[in-house]
Each structure stands twice: as structure tokens, then as C-alpha cells.
Amino acid sequence: MNTTSNETLTTVTQQSFIIHPNKILLMILYRYGLGFVFLIGFSGNFASLVTFMSPILRVMSTGCLFFMLAMADIFYLMISIFEFVEVGIVQEGIFLSVYDSICRFRWFMKGFIRFCSAWILAFIAIDRWLRTRFPYKTNQWCTRRNAFIAVSIAAVFAILLHSHMLSSQLFGGLFPGTPSIACGPIDTRSPYVFFFFVQWQIIQ
């Protein structure tokens, strides 16, 4: 298994350098690309928050779901600021003394938010379908309470699914400052390397 783990890590490292051969181009993409994403993303999502906080929309399940989706997007953008600074501005690993803890927090939160956002979008589609297909059941099924329950269930599953990233024995800094492999398995000889780089990519 150690041989498999080492081969997996070597392959991932080689692929990373193939994907990012030009550091200057990578820096430009992160600095200006993410900067543009932040500008559009923050302004658009804050506008959504203002819209769905209105008295008329916030009493509807659909309005609550869109509000939570905007909040999730804002949190995801905030977490991405670290990569913007590390790769696009400083161009090397930052906060190295606590890098392992930052890795665990960032990767767990990014996975958690992506999972929840995907399910919130699914719940919005289901909510709209129920309102169209069963209009007489709208007041019973499409409520804020049910929306919160559905999102809470998705959040619990997201925590369980991504909890391995919070383990200080398994996850931490790998190659600080290198996109896609800045964080990863701490012990490069453990079976977790194969799980994270191969099996986890399929699971998530």
C-alpha cells in the first residue's frame, strides 16, 4: 500500500506541474481572474441578500432557499481570498506556522459549502416543481420550516462526508503555495493518499 501511495502522490505532483507550467501566467490568472470573480460575486450575492430579505420574499420557502444559497456563495468567496493572496499576490505559502490548521479549515469548509450549495439548488428546483404540480399543497409542503429542515439534513451529511479533512492525523499542508496540491494527506505513505487523490475525487 505504501508503494501505491507513493506512486499516487508522484503522479499527482507531476500532473500539477504539467497543469501549472507557467508561474507568471498562473499568478495573473489568480490575481486578476479571482479579483474579477470577487467583484462580481460579492456584489451579486449581496444584492441577492438584500432582495430576499424583503418582507414578501423571506416568508416564502423559495426566498429562504435563495437567501441561504447567497450566504453560502459569500462564505465560499471569503474562503477563496486565501488562495487569491497566496497564489496571486504573495506567490508562496503564507502563515506556514499554522498552515496545517488553515488547510483543514479551508478544505473542509469549501467541500461543505459546495455540497450544501448543490443541494440547495436541488431543493429550489423541487420547491418550484411542487408549487407548480401541487398548488393546493403549497402552504403545507413549501414552508420555511421544511426548507430549513431540508438544508439542515444536507448540512449534517456534508459534515459527515467531509469530516476526514478535520483530522490532524490525516490532513494538512502538502505543498504550500501550489494550487490544487497545497493541502493534502500529511503522511505520504499512508493509504489515505490513495483515498484522497483517487477515491475521494469520485465520491465528491
Tell what function each PLM region has.
Residues 9-20, 89-112, 139-140, 160-204:
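Loop architecture of class A 7-transmembrane GPCRs
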